[in-house]
């Protein structure tokens, strides 16, 4: 299937097979599609609605082209979300990653600089003094020795350079907004994946199942947050051993009070880092609570904790003991030595 055939199909609302989507993504990622063809296809696909087959095929192509990080899969988890929730919140998943590592998990944290948010995971880690310019081998050693490593997306997904311009110029959400969290270069089999819309909950859980993931929670909160929220109930699609179940969870299920999201908003990476340091230092409040909710979920899917509630208690202990604050310093020190 060539690009013109693909554009005709999606604009007529015809779904592509996995084989057809694989061919089209190959053209895009190898730079053989023009910017106009890429834009036309991605917008047409979005208006039709991407299927599980199409997203699975696209993610496989990206995974095959990625520069891999070779680490053992045991208790390995990613806390990468789609972003795009426009909440202005601090970097919750980045803080969670540090707490998870301090509690005994192993985190391959996939992320990038900010596109639409006040601060991306790369921005806040750089502000903390973390060196992002690591080779895949150095990232692997970081995960093994520190318990958490940052997989800076541009270093691992070089083929994405062909899509950067058209994506920026279109200014609308497309397939690429959800592909990032599906293409962890370390192949983390466990994941807490926040999405910007309920529409993606079950489909992405099923896609990750097809891609070989073991235990995943795909989450979207009723207040719009692409995390497990402290401000509202959160809908969860949980993939475990090939089965997907959907449920609603709320802060009060775990003995926490709801809080307005305005209390966790920041203006920039420096503000996000200050809030993260406060959480890691044990300051009580909604920022700490939302990190506990999300870190607890990551410890649960990584099979470090037997339940979400147990994961929250393990995360709480990692903060109270000082291990979480120490973990950030260990990450800074290790990457500085590379």
UniProtKB/Swiss-Prot annotation:
Gene: trpD
Enzyme class of the recorded protein, top EC level: transferase
Residues that, per the record, bind anthranilate 1: 81, 112
Metal-binding listed as a keyword: yes
Annotated organism of origin: Thioalkalivibrio sulfidiphilus (strain HL-EbGR7)
Role: Catalyzes the transfer of the phosphoribosyl group of 5-phosphorylribose-1-pyrophosphate (PRPP) to anthranilate to yield N-(5'-phosphoribosyl)-anthranilate (PRA).
Pathway(s) this gene product operates in, as recorded in its UniProt entry: Amino-acid biosynthesis; L-tryptophan biosynthesis; L-tryptophan from chorismate: step 2/5
Name assigned to this protein: Anthranilate phosphoribosyltransferase
Catalytic activity entry: N-(5-phospho-beta-D-ribosyl)anthranilate + diphosphate = 5-phospho-alpha-D-ribose 1-diphosphate + anthranilate
Residues involved in 5-phospho-alpha-D-ribose 1-diphosphate binding: 81, 84-85, 89, 91-94, 109-117, 121
Cofactor annotation remark: Binds 2 magnesium ions per monomer.
């Amino acid at each position: 299937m060539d690009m013109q055939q693909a554009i005709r199909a999606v604009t007529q609302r015809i779904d592509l097979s996995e084989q057809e989507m694989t061919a089209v993504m190959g053209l895009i990622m190898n730079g053989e599609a023009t910017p106009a063809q890429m834009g036309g296809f991605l917008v047409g696909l979005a208006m039709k609605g991407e299927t599980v087959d199409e997203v699975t095929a696209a993610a496989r192509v990206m995974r095959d082209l990625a520069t891999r990080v070779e680490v053992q899969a045991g208790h390995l988890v990613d806390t990468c979300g789609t972003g795009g929730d426009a909440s202005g919140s601090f970097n919750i998943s980045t803080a969670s990653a540090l707490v998870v590592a301090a509690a005994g998990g192993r985190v391959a944290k996939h992320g990038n600089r900010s596109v639409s948010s006040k601060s991306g995971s790369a921005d806040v880690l750089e502000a903390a003094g973390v060196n992002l310019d690591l080779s895949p081998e150095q990232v692997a050693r970081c995960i093994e020795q520190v318990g958490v490593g940052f997989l800076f997306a541009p270093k691992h997904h070089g083929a994405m350079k062909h899509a950067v311009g058209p994506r920026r110029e279109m200014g609308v959400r497309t397939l690429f907004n959800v592909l990032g969290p599906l293409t962890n270069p370390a192949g983390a089999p466990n994941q807490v994946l926040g999405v910007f819309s309920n529409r993606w909950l079950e489909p992405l859980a099923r896609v990750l199942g097809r891609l070989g993931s073991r235990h995943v929670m795909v989450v979207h909160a009723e207040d719009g947050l692409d995390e497990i929220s402290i401000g509202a109930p959160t809908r969860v699609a949980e993939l475990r051993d090939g089965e997907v179940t959907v449920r609603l969870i709320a802060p009060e299920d775990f003995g926490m009070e709801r809080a307005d999201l305005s209390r966790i908003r920041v203006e920039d990476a420096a503000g996000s880092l200050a809030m993260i340091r406060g959480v890691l230092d044990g300051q009580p409040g909604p920022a700490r609570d939302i990190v506990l909710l999300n870190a607890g979920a990551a410890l649960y899917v990584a099979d470090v904790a037997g339940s979400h509630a147990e994961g929250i208690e393990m995360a709480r202990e990692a903060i109270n003991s000082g291990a979480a604050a120490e973990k950030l310093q260990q990450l800074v020190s290790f990457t500085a030595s590379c």
